[in-house]
Amino acid sequence: MNDVTTAGTSAKITVDPDDFTFVHYETGQIVDVVSELGGLLGMGNPVHVIVDETTPAAKLSAGVDGTSSDAQVTIHAQSGALDDFQRLTHFGADNARQSLGRMMLRARDRMRADFADAPADLDLSLRQNAAWDAYCAGRLARAGVPMSEQRWRYNYRNRFGFSDAVDADFDRLWAADDLGWHDLGAD
């Protein structure tokens, strides 16, 4: 496990594995992205990123071991979530920012009392996942991370339907900053 405390932040960022053999990633690339996101999102929590480099799938999950500002955030990422879309098996900083940023926001949400009822990431329904992704992606966009609103709108429509009412609900999630779990409307 590579253990790094980055300059300008007190957050301890660790990455597993230390050395990648199936994908062309450097641990430092992941540390840099997580450190940058920590600054953008105002998160100083220690973060542990575990990358499954044996699959090109893009599944992500995040967990947190408490509700304090020093609670450990653990992110599990299949390597496809961090790949450069133009050069698969190579690190893509933009894709990593979007993927890891969504998981960091989920972890930050989970530290709030109004997210206490949220299921673990791997237990979320497709609708719950789509709603939370829309909420996180909108916040990332406002923080300065380039996000494709249309991509997340389409993902949301695929789970909730194609209608003006569904689009209005997506717009509400995309523009929101302080929703609780039950406000996401995907129960």
Model-derived features with residue positions:
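Post-HExxH zinc-binding segment in Zn-dependent metallohydrolases
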Residues: 120-155
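Short pre-active-site segment immediately N-terminal to the catalytic Zn-binding motif
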Residues: 81-99
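Pan-zinc metallopeptidase signature
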Residues: 159-187
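Auxiliary, metal-adjacent structural segments of Zn-dependent hydrolase domains
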Residues: 2-80, 138-139, 143-145
